[in-house]
């Protein structure tokens, strides 16, 4: 493991963090009195688009998981379509899970679905960029001692931190503080966002700190 690889990971992750800050501040130049809380649905769409774009561009430029086999154009198109289908499936699956855990079934459907979209953006999109629509690779990465690179280590950390942040964000909702951010699903989306950002920042630092203990198996 080289320090240059960890630096590449750090810079890539910081770009993703920067994309979230852009989604917060850029709309205020075009929309009067723009606020993440007051225009929350709009911000969720902007944030998802921004993070997805940066993830795609980063992985296309950095290419952390380059295959030695040269694939045809039709194979690349098929792979891209499969990734889109997987992303949509993850959005609907998360939406169903949220409803099963107590989210409104009929009311606030759009809010719940956009929460599923943004959480899928933080978790599924990086997995698809790095691993593709390969179920075996996903199971390997998220199993014990299954990672083969620092990029997969970072993927583990950011995915877990995003879900943890979303879960912790649900705790303030039933409290009688009467704050605007307690409305479903604002606290959960903010929790997921903070968790994602924390994972992006912590993962390169954790990998650097434990670089001597970390060993990776070849694919």
UniProtKB/Swiss-Prot annotation:
Subcellular location: Endoplasmic reticulum membrane
Regions that span the bilayer: 11-31, 42-62, 86-106, 113-133, 155-175, 189-209
Entry's Gene Ontology cellular component terms: endoplasmic reticulum membrane
UniProt keyword rRNA processing present: no
One protein family per Pfam: PIG-F
Membrane-topology annotation of the record: Multi-pass membrane protein
GO biological process: GPI anchor biosynthetic process
Keywords recorded for this protein, A-Z: Endoplasmic reticulum, GPI-anchor biosynthesis, Membrane, Transmembrane, Transmembrane helix
Presence of the UniProt keyword Endoplasmic reticulum in the record: yes
Organism domain of life: Eukaryota
Pathway the protein acts in: Glycolipid biosynthesis; glycosylphosphatidylinositol-anchor biosynthesis
Molecular function per GO: mannose-ethanolamine phosphotransferase activity
Function statement: Stabilizing subunit of the ethanolamine phosphate transferase 3 and ethanolamine phosphate transferase 2 complexes that sequentially transfer an ethanolamine phosphate (EtNP) from a phosphatidylethanolamine (PE) to the 6-OH position of the third alpha-1,2-linked mannose and the second alpha-1,6-linked mannose of the alpha-D-Man-(1->2)-alpha-D-Man-(1->6)-2-PEtn-alpha-D-Man-(1->4)-alpha-D-GlcN-(1->6)-(1-radyl,2-acyl-sn-glycero-3-phospho)-2-acyl-inositol (also termed H6) intermediate to generate a 6-PEtn-alpha-D-Man-(1->2)-6-PEtn-alpha-D-Man-(1->6)-2-PEtn-alpha-D-Man-(1->4)-alpha-D-GlcN-(1->6)-(1-radyl,2-acyl-sn-glycero-3-phospho)-2-acyl-inositol (also termed H8).
Family note: Belongs to the PIGF family.
Quaternary structure annotation from Swiss-Prot or TrEMBL: Part of the ethanolamine phosphate transferase 3 complex composed by PIGO and PIGF. Part of the ethanolamine phosphate transferase 2 complex with PIGG. PIGF is required to stabilize PIGG and PIGO.
Protein known as: GPI ethanolamine phosphate transferase, stabilizing subunit
Name of the encoding gene: Pigf
């Amino acid at each position: 493991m080289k320090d240059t690889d960890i630096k590449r990971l750090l810079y890539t992750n910081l770009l993703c963090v920067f994309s979230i800050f852009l989604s917060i501040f850029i709309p205020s130049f075009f929309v009067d009195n723009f606020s993440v809380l007051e225009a929350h649905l709009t911000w969720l769409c902007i944030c998802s688009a921004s993070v997805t774009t940066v993830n795609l561009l980063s992985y296309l430029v950095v290419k952390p998981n380059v295959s030695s086999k040269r694939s045809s154009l039709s194979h690349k198109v098929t792979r891209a379509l499969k990734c889109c289908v997987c992303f949509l499936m993850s959005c609907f699956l998360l939406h169903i899970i949220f409803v099963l855990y107590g989210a409104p079934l009929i009311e606030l459907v759009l809010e719940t679905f956009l929460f599923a979209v943004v959480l899928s953006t933080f978790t599924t999109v990086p997995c698809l960029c790095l691993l593709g629509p390969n179920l075996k690779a996903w199971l390997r990465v998220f199993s014990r001692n299954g990672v083969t690179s620092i990029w997969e280590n970072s993927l583990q950390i950011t995915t877990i931190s995003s879900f943890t942040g979303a879960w912790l964000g649900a705790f303030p909702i039933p409290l009688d503080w009467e704050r605007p951010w307690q409305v479903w699903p604002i606290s959960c989306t903010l929790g997921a966002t903070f968790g994602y950002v924390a994972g992006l920042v912590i993962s390169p630092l954790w990998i650097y700190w434990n670089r001597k203990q970390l060993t990776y198996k070849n694919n």
